[in-house]
Amino acid sequence: MKSDISTRSDGTTSRRRFLAAGVGTLGLGTFGGCLSSVRGDGRDPVKFGMVAPLSGSLERIGTHCKRAVEQAVADVNDAGGVLDRPVELVVVDSGASAETAVSEYESMRGEGVVGFVGGLVSDVSIALAPKAAEDGLMEVSPASTSPSLTGAGVNGDRTFFGRTIPSDLLQSVVMAKALDDPRYVDADRVSLVYIDNAYGSGLAEALHENLSASVAADVAYDPSADDFAPVVEEAFADDPDAVGFVSASGQEKGVLDAYDASDYEAPWVFSTGMLSGDLPSYYEGFYSASLSSVRTNGYLTLTKKLSELDPIAPYAVNGYDALMLMAAAAEHAGEAAGPAIADSIRAVSGGTGHTFSVGEFDRARALLDAGRDVNYQGAASGVDLNADLEPLSPYVVERVTDGGVEQLELIQKGYFGGDGQ
């Protein structure tokens, strides 16, 4: 008799088909106890969480990301849910504070979530990763880029932290290229101005390692300060050729307004995510190391679904991808539990399997039911996760020219070495 247990090309066994075979052979009465522990009774919801800044300076990013994650939940439920169970979303407000996030995480965990999207801010993800690993919950961040998160969230032989946004190690290489390259800024001496948190300090440290230019000043700043003139004065005290600026949309304005009000003049190179909307005239000639904004089919489908968010905030589409990967991983594993999701999330993110994308969770379920490999093609990118459960992504060197953003050079992900699965 031909076995119903199938082995995929990634070496994993299709547990969903194994369960079906067990029920057919043994009968529901014999196998019912085991079945309910894995698949539920068809009514109990699978709960995923979200930790996001829904108030404060990052409120727009947090609320847009929440809306995208809600859309992912709706798409999964429209396809029949995870393992025939509806998905529910438990959302808590981190307020962009690690202390608040830890408190709200405990509340969310008490609701019975098996994994969560978040944090957005690197400080929050750094605080939550060890807790999630200890509790056996899968955490997938759509926006935390600190290099210190590579290898975070490990418990035994499992990694419980992943992200759908690449590490700042990649961004630092592109910022350094824009500052050093004779085709761009061609600076000999650079001042680094960075937001005073794990994201800012981590990217600044990586810039030190990748710059050929000497660093004239390191200036950390508090985005909630009342006066930013001292930040600009310190940055220009030793007459640098350029400024490398590490910040985030919504937290950069104070420093840049202070620069505009000063008599200093030099090109700036921005970290990603700050060249959007109406650009001030003094941005002319500024550069950015930006994530490549390739409009994938998944991106176009999702932004059409989220047409009320125009323009959509950075990282929102990454939030959609985070939820979809966890849902697909649970479906692949045949079990809606954190350890099972951690074991399967890389397998559904890349490789040579059959592709599915935004709004196609029904296709993923059908393929997995048939014992096939799947490969999620996300809204943000292909999202092929490496062994540290983070993607490599292409970047673009951009420059503000005549009030618009000009793309100067595409840096393919192969430039950074390595690969996803």
Say what each PLM segment does.
Residues K2-L26, F31-Q421:
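Extracytosolic ligand-binding ectodomains
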